A protein has these predicted regions:
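Short, polar/acidic, helix-capping and beta-turn segments at strand->helix junctions
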Residues: 1-132
Length: 132
């Protein structure tokens, strides 16, 4: 499966590298086969970041879309680092942070937006990491 063909089938366009909010690397290679990837906000080419809390200002579905947008940004950053997303052999770990109201407990469902995108683009064997 060619990752770029799959992205096109899903209607996903890769973006320019994510603007950084501090002094750090978007992607940091470690050894020959591992990349550490910085997190990113859910901005896209059309509108700015979502700012607010799940459970009070945003629904679970809107949170899932934000998580999906974050993953598109991460995949875009990986493309710019690697030059070819087909080089990726496995995603090992997905760590997600969700800003939420005090009585919101559906964080796993929100992060499914990012996990589902990885699975849809890369398949189960490559795109289904452990998650926290």
């Amino acid at each position: 499966m060619n990752v770029y063909d799959r992205l096109e089938e899903l209607g996903i366009k890769l973006l320019d590298p994510t603007p950084k909010g501090g002094i750090y690397s978007l992607v940091r290679p470690y050894g020959d086969h591992l990349l550490y990837v910085s997190g990113t906000a859910p901005h896209n080419a059309v509108d700015s970041n979502m700012a607010g809390k799940l459970g009070s200002e945003y629904t679970i579905e809107e949170g899932q879309e934000a998580a999906r947008r974050c993953m598109i940004n991460i995949i875009s950053n990986l493309h710019h680092e690697l030059g070819d997303l087909n080089r990726i052999r496995q995603f090992v770990k997905l760590l997600g942070f969700v800003a939420s109201a005090p009585d919101f407990y559906e964080h796993p469902q929100v992060l499914n937006g990012a996990s589902q995108l990885l699975k849809d683009v890369f398949g189960d064997e490559i795109g289904l990491p452990a998650r926290s």
